[in-house]
Each structure stands twice: as structure tokens, then as C-alpha cells.
Amino acid sequence: NEKATYDDWQNHLTTLFPQVRLKQYLEIRSMDACSWNEICGQPAFWTGILYDNDCLDEVNNIIKDWTLEDKFFLYKNAPIYGLDTPFKKGKLIDIARLLLKISQTGLKNRNFVSKGGYDERQYLKNIEINLENNLSPADKLINKYNQDWGKSIKNIYKENIF
């Protein structure tokens, strides 16, 4: 006849892993297939968007008319087709490139500069290169699997452990 307490529910919620989870802070699920030199890109990407109101407004203008069906379509198809996923009048890569530019603007506006004179946009460089080459981190791994690794999955662990 025990009843769950608030602390019990708090504990249970830590076992759920949605794309975004609201805690004392906003927790966003990380990219699953990135290398060590790409790992700082995702938090920088979100920082550029979420910490700049103009950038948030720009992103809102892009997505405000997306229906639930649109979002479900992307959720279902992006893992299969990646950046080549057809969406609206283009492909997912078109949206990714646009969002990257918005994030770069947000980081530039934020103006957090290192002692070496670099702002946080430096962390987006690998994402920018990937998008210029029409490749996601998963695409790069698939290419290595098919071409360099002789279709052996073992090398993924050797090259991507950190």
C-alpha cells in the first residue's frame, strides 16, 4: 500500500530519454554518431540558437507552420534518409544549413572570445564542413564501413572511442 512520493517520480523521470527533457535546465539529447572533433559542435549549435532572441525568432519563423504530421514525418524519415530526407520544397540538408547560419549568427552576437581571439563559432566548423560535403556523421561512418573497413563493424570502436 505504498504510494509514490514526489522524489520517487523525480527518480523515475531520470530513466526516460526523450529528445528534450526539462529539469532544472533544458537537457537536449546529443548526437549519437559523432567523433571526438565534432562533439563540441552540438552544444555550440544549440547555444547559438537558444541564447539569442533574434535567432530564436528566426527559427520559430521557419518551423511555426510545421504540422504534427510534418514533425512525425521528419522523426520517422530522417534516421533512414538523413540529410537527403525530402521535406517541404527541398531536403533536410537545406534546413540544416539554414539553422547552422542562424546558430553562427547567435554565437557571433554572443561574442564570447577566447584568449586566442576565437569565438564559439569555431566549434561549428566540423558541422559546416559536413554540410558542405552533404554528409552527416552517420554518413561518414557508413562510408568508412563500406569502403575503408571492409564491412567490419569492429573499426567503429577503434576509431570512435573517447
Regions found by a protein language model. Give the residues of each.
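C-terminal accessory/tail domains of diverse enzymes
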Residues: N1-F162
